[in-house]
Curated annotation (Swiss-Prot):
SUPFAM superfamilies linked: HisI-like (SSF141734)
Similarity comment: family membership: Belongs to the PRA-CH family.
Keyword vocabulary terms for this entry: Amino-acid biosynthesis, Cytoplasm, Histidine biosynthesis, Hydrolase, Magnesium, Metal-binding, Zinc
Function of the molecule: Catalyzes the hydrolysis of the adenine ring of phosphoribosyl-AMP.
NCBIfam families: PRK00051.1 (NF000768)
The UniProt record lists the keyword Hydrolase: yes
UniProt gene name: hisI
A single cellular component GO annotation: cytoplasm
Subcellular location: Cytoplasm
Catalysed reactions, semicolon-separated: 1-(5-phospho-beta-D-ribosyl)-5'-AMP + H2O = 1-(5-phospho-beta-D-ribosyl)-5-[(5-phospho-beta-D-ribosylamino)methylideneamino]imidazole-4-carboxamide
Highest taxon in the source lineage: Bacteria
Free-text cofactor note: Binds 1 Mg(2+) ion per subunit.
Gene Ontology molecular function terms on file: magnesium ion binding; phosphoribosyl-AMP cyclohydrolase activity; zinc ion binding
Protein name: Phosphoribosyl-AMP cyclohydrolase
Amino acid sequence: MSISPPDDLVASVTFDDRGLVPAIAQQEGTGEVLMMAWMNAESLRATLETGWATYWSRSRGELWRKGETSGHLQRVRAVHADCDGDTLLLTVDQTGPACHTGTRTCFTGRELVMPPAAVDPEEAAR
């Protein structure tokens, strides 16, 4: 199996009208979802070339290598595109917490409780 050059891989991704694509970081080995961030073509290319997760900061308008200042780096082990090519899944080896709040994941402490279903899902599936 041959490995495609980064530019070919970047060209295969469907970016939105702002030139961005959502990227979900997942811990290698456990499958734990760590965070979601945005990538543009330049940050995806940097990620593919260096092996370190590099995102696009919408608030700062610049590339952002995850953990560059905190030391909480993400070593990228694999990048997968979904079936439409408009969402990326990065399998990473996370050093330290992934979230800027200091928690392991960005999905800690904000669980939205589902209301009781009006219809039993198993009943509706029949």
